[in-house]
Regions:
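Extended intrinsically disordered, low-complexity coil regions enriched in Ser, Thr, Gly, Ala
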Residues: 19, 52-57, 67-75, 164, ...
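Sequence context surrounding c-type heme c attachment/ligation sites in exported
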Residues: 2-11, 145-159, 167-176, 201, ...
C-alpha cells in the first residue's frame, strides 16, 4: 500500500507543501482552468479525514470517483487513471493511509464558479469522458511493456500532466503523452519512439531521470521535480525500467507547423 501510494504521488497533492503542511493532511490549492480545488485530508481523522471511511468507500473513490457520501469527486483527483487498479491494490493503499497519524485540519472551500461548484455537474463530465475499466494485459507484448503501461496509465497517471486536454479538462486520445499544461507549466511530450519528444533518450536515460533526477538532456523542473523527489525515486528499478520500455515503444507523428497569423488582419 505504501509503495502504491508513493507511485501515485498521493503525498504531493495531499500535502499543503507551500505552507509547510502536514503530509497527507490535504489543503493544497490545486489551480485548474475552472477554479481552485483544495486537496482532501487522507489521514484517518474522523471529522475531516478518512477515519470513518470503509475500504469499499475508498475503492469507490479511486475506481468510480465517488466519496463516502455518494458525491461525485472532481477529476482533479486522478480517478480516471486510478480506476485501472484492482480492489486488492486499493485496499492496500487504504490500509497504509489508515496507519498514518490522524490529523484534524480546517477544510478549505473549493473556489469554483456556478454550476461547477455543484458536484452533480461532474456526473455529466463522467458520462462524456470517464470509463470505469480494468487493466488488460496485451498478450503480444512483453511483461515489462505491460507493467510499464499499467504504471504509466494507472498509478503514475502520467497523462494527467503530459496529455493535452479538451476545453472541459478531459484528456484527448490523439494527444496522449504528447505534452500538456498544468498550472501554467508545460509538461513535455514523453513519447520515446520515433519522432517522440524523448526519442533521443535511451531507456537508461529515462531510468536515471526518474530514479535520480538527472539526465544528459535536462533536469526535473517544477512539478516534475516533486514527482521525482516524492514518488519515482522510491520505485523499484524493475518498475522504472518497465516504464522506460513502454515509453520507448510509443512512436509519434511530426506535427504540422502552425501558420503564423496574417499581420495585415
Amino acid at each position: 500500500g505504501r509503495y502504491l501510494a508513493q507511485a501515485g504521488d498521493c503525498k504531493a497533492c495531499h500535502t499543503d507543501i507551500d505552507n509547510d503542511g502536514i503530509p497527507f493532511a490535504g489543503g493544497r490549492a490545486l489551480k485548474t482552468p475552472f477554479g481552485t480545488i483544495y486537496s482532501a485530508n487522507l489521514t484517518p481523522e474522523d471529522e475531516t479525514g478518512l477515519g470513518r471511511w470503509s475500504r469499499e468507500d475508498f475503492y469507490n473513490a479511486l475506481n468510480e470517483g465517488i466519496d463516502d457520501e455518494g458525491r461525485h469527486l472532481y477529476p482533479a483527483m486522478p480517478y480516471p487513471y486510478f480506476t485501472l487498479m484492482t480492489r486488492q491494490q486499493t485496499d492496500a493503499i487504504f490500509a497504509y493511509l489508515q496507519s498514518l497519524e490522524p490529523v484534524h485540519v480546517e477544510e478549505e472551500e473549493n473556489d469554483l464558479p456556478f454550476p461547477l461548484n455543484i458536484r452533480m455537474s461532474v456526473s455529466g463530465w463522467k458520462l462524456l469522458f470517464f470509463e470505469d475499466e480494468e487493466f488488460e494485459v496485451d498478450p503480444d507484448r512483453s511483461e515489462a511493456w505491460n507493467r510499464g503501461r499499467f504504471l504509466v496509465d494507472g498509478p503514475l497517471h502520467c497523462g494527467g500532466c503530459h496529455t493535452g486536454k479538451n476545453i472541459l479538462g478531459a484528456g484527448k486520445d490523439d494527444e496522449y503523452l504528447r505534452g500538456g499544461t498544468l498550472e501554467n507549466w508545460f509538461a513535455p511530450n514523453i513519447r520515446g519512439g520515433e519522432n517522440g519528444g524523448i526519442a533521443h533518450w535511451s531507456e537508461d536515460d529515462i531510468f536515471e531521470f526518474l530514479k535520480y533526477g538527472r539526465a544528459k538532456h535536462t533536469a526535473p523542473m517544477q512539478r516534475m521535480g516533486e514527482v521525482v523527489s516524492i514518488s519515482t525515486q522510491f520505485l523499484e528499478e524493475k518498475d522504472l525500467r518497465s516504464v522506460a520500455t513502454y515509453l520507448k515503444s510509443l512512436d509519434d507523428t511530426p506535427r504540422e507547423p502552425e501558420e503564423a497569423p496574417d499581420p495585415a488582419q
